[in-house]
């Protein structure tokens, strides 16, 4: 795997292939039939990843993944609905903030940052509050890399007749989610994560029946997924100026995704990256924050060294000078830093990153790990 520096060991934006970057060198007319066909092909390929063509629509939206999350909640949760937000990290808290800003009634259930929400938790919460209409959760909480038990939670939500909204930003394309087996109203992801496109486009897999009933719910013209889908279905076009180069890059990235072997192969490479990282960092004495049983192969949080000579900014700049971009920690209780396992990188790239980190710690004379 040929990789250009710097290598972004982050959860997105991430390192992309030369072919993906090359795809952005062509300009597209936003109303041109060829571009409309590109968008339609993109949505078909995305739906195929979740086996969702019969049950869900793929609604693309300009902007970051958070734009798409806000659009999904604003469109699919009625104004008199109530959302149970499951939280064990920063992105769950962001979900709650979105509900607050949109004026949707909500309650929260928060566990520690190293504790997944359980199906038993959700069962108890739904039994206690019949006014809840929707449950929202983060599949892979990017602030730590923790994986929440989606299939089990989805079954509990469905058994109570409630609707499920899944933020799968950091898992879609790498971890299996089958719409035929996991009932959900919305699953949200974005171009610049495990599909290895560039940032700038989110997309929502919305249950067909729920989206059809969602007219008038949205708080925003631009983020109205019901209107976005209706217009696209009628005209083949985006309502407002699309991110043409981002769409073209994602289309090319999906071709490479299929060539690699689709989700099983992408998952296998990321899992190998993750294990290579854990093994290598462990040899340096660096401890991961999560036990491996709940660690998703997306991003790994490591405890910062105890040595007072360790300062993250200096550490970051030195590792960057060796060709690798890391991610700061996002925990409130302990000092950490994060290393991503995703993007156009393989085992050799992860080994090189560990070697660079080892050199930097030696240069900084960090002895107390």
Swiss-Prot record:
Its EC number is 2.6.1.37. The keyword Cell membrane does not apply. The modification N6-(pyridoxal phosphate)lysine is found at residue 193. Its cofactor is pyridoxal 5'-phosphate. GO terms for molecular function: 2-aminoethylphosphonate-pyruvate transaminase activity. It comes from the Bacteria. It is an enzyme of class 2 (transferase). InterPro entries: Aminotrans_V_dom, NH2EtPonate_pyrv_transaminase, PyrdxlP-dep_Trfase, PyrdxlP-dep_Trfase_major, PyrdxlP-dep_Trfase_small, SP_NH2Trfase/AEP_transaminase. One of its GO terms (biological process) is organic phosphonate catabolic process. It catalyses: (2-aminoethyl)phosphonate + pyruvate = phosphonoacetaldehyde + L-alanine. Keywords: Aminotransferase, Pyridoxal phosphate, Pyruvate, Transferase. Involved in phosphonate degradation. NCBIfam families: PhnW-AepZ, PRK13479.1, transamin_PhnW. Homodimer. HAMAP family: PhnW_aminotrans_5. Belongs to the class-V pyridoxal-phosphate-dependent aminotransferase family. PhnW subfamily. This is 2-aminoethylphosphonate--pyruvate transaminase. The lineage of its organism: Bacteria, Pseudomonadati, Pseudomonadota, Gammaproteobacteria, Pseudomonadales. The gene is phnW.
């Amino acid at each position: 795997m040929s990789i250009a520096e710097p290598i972004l060991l982050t959860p997105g934006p991430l390192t992309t292939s030369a072919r993906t970057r090359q795809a952005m060198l062509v300009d597209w007319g936003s109303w041109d039939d060829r571009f409309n066909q590109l968008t339609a092909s993109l949505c078909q390929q995305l739906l195929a990843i979740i086996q969702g063509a019969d049950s869900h629509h793929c609604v693309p939206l300009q902007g970051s993944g958070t734009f798409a999350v806000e659009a999904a909640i604003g469109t699919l949760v009625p104004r008199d609905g109530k959302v149970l937000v499951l939280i064990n990290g920063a992105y769950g808290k962001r979900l709650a903030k979105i509900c607050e800003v949109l004026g949707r009634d909500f309650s929260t259930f928060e566990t520690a940052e190293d504790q997944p929400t359980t199906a038993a938790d959700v069962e108890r919460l739904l039994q206690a509050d019949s006014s809840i209409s929707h449950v929202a959760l983060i599949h892979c909480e990017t602030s730590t890399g923790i994986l929440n038990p989606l299939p089990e939670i989805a079954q509990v939500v469905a058994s109570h007749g409630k609707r499920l909204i899944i933020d799968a930003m950091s898992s879609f394309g790498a971890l299996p989610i089958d719409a035929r087996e996991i009932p959900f109203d919305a699953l949200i992801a974005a171009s610049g994560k495990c599909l290895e496109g560039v940032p700038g486009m989110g997309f929502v897999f919305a249950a067909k029946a729920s989206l059809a009933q969602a007219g008038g719910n949205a708080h925003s013209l631009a983020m109205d997924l019901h209107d976005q889908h209706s217009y696209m279905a009628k005209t083949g076009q985006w309502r407002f100026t699309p991110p043409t180069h981002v769409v073209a890059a994602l289309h090319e990235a999906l071709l490479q995704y299929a060539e690699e072997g689709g989700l099983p192969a992408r998952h296998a490479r990321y899992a190998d990256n993750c294990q290579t990282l854990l093994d290598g960092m462990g040899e340096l004495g660096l401890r991961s924050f999560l036990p491996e049983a709940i660690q998703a192969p997306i991003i790994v949080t490591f405890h910062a060294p105890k040595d007072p000579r360790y300062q993250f900014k200096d550490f970051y700049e030195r590792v960057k000078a060796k060709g690798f971009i890391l991610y700061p920690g996002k925990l409130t209780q302990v000092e950490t830093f994060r290393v991503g396992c995703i993007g156009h990188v393989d085992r050799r790239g992860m080994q090189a990153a560990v070697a660079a980190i080892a050199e930097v710690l030696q240069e900084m004379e960090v002895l107390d790990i």
